Amino acid sequence: MIDSVNRADLFLRKPAPVALELQNEIEQFYYWEAKLLNDRRFDEWFALLAKDIHYFMPIRTTRIMRDSRLEYSGLRDYAHFDDDATMMKGRLRKITSDVSWSENPASRTRHIVSNVMIIPTEVEGEYEISSTFIVYRNRLERQLDIFAGERRDRLRRNKGEAGFEIVNRTILIDQSTILANNLSFFF
């Protein structure tokens, strides 16, 4: 398995331009994904995930400059999320149930995705993507959380209505200390 944190090396230089149609297709896919998450249409969102999904959010630590490559935990270290399809399905069941105190009442979220850069891979129809995000979450009366960061995805073209599926997602948040009560939502 590719160390998804170190896939950043793919984006050390400006990617070669891709066809505008492909850029638009992928951006529209992300906008649709954000709408599904914001509208809490989790079953439809889950259908965008590949059966071999790896959903990973490493822990970020503050490091001095010479140790900056150790800023994020690796695949064999602790992580906020290190999920496959089965784990994702369990998380989905939990946050949509009436017994999950962390999402009952449900959070109100707004996902904003931007700065989408695309690199075609050696596999036909698969793409490495870097995008930036902001997730705004409001819950109950006064709980407010804002997360910003980068998502590194591998998308695979498929015949589904959305046109792609998410094979791999790595979420690199800008915060090293998470002040939110929980992480009971999806990025």
From Swiss-Prot:
Q: Which family does it belong to?
A: Belongs to the bacterial ring-hydroxylating dioxygenase beta subunit family.
**What would be an example GO MF term here?**
benzene 1,2-dioxygenase activity
Q: In which pathway does it act?
A: Aromatic compound metabolism; benzene degradation; catechol from benzene: step 1/2
Q: Which Gene Ontology biological process is one annotated for this entry?
A: 3-phenylpropionate catabolic process
Which keywords, in A-to-Z order, does the entry hold?
Answer: Aromatic hydrocarbons catabolism, Dioxygenase, NAD, Oxidoreductase, Plasmid
One Pfam family it belongs to = Ring_hydroxyl_B
Assembly and interaction partners: This dioxygenase system consists of four proteins: the two subunits of the hydroxylase component (BedC1 and BedC2), a ferredoxin (BedB) and a ferredoxin reductase (BedA).
- How would you classify this enzyme at the top EC level? oxidoreductase
Instruction: List the catalysed reactions.
Output: benzene + NADH + O2 + H(+) = cis-1,2-dihydrobenzene-1,2-diol + NAD(+)
Protein name per UniProt? Benzene 1,2-dioxygenase subunit beta
| SUPFAM superfamilies recorded | NTF2-like (SSF54427)
Lineage, highest ranks first: Bacteria, Pseudomonadati, Pseudomonadota, Gammaproteobacteria, Pseudomonadales
Purpose: The beta subunit may be responsible for the substrate specificity of the enzyme.
The Enzyme Commission number assigned here is 1.14.12.3
